[in-house]
Amino acid sequence: MNDNKYSDFKFLHFNKTLKAIGEKKIVSPIHIRIKPTNVCNHDCWYCAYHSSDVQLGDQMTYRDVIPYEKLDEIANDIVKMGVAAVTFSGGGEPLLYKKLPEIIEKLHKGGVKVATLTNG
């Protein structure tokens, strides 16, 4: 098997998950992507999130932030479920989320791999 990190067959490394799916069992996700905030420190003219056509949903605003208590609860659930990895990204800059280091530390201590997509 190719050891390329970007292989289309990377999912084959998760044999237990594949077996459980084949047995029609409910399994936790391997990877979760979280957008902790829409707040951004740039004002890029080409950004889709600045478009008047962007559909954020009825309950969302341009500068939304997931409340810390909710994100902490989500992090606890991710660890309990045995999720392998989390990526923080968003319509904003995830590193502007003030308590992100605490959440990342909790996930790391729980054995979850963490990545962040940033504009910096």
Regions flagged by a language model, labelled:
Residues N2-G120:
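Conserved alpha-helical substructure of the radical SAM core
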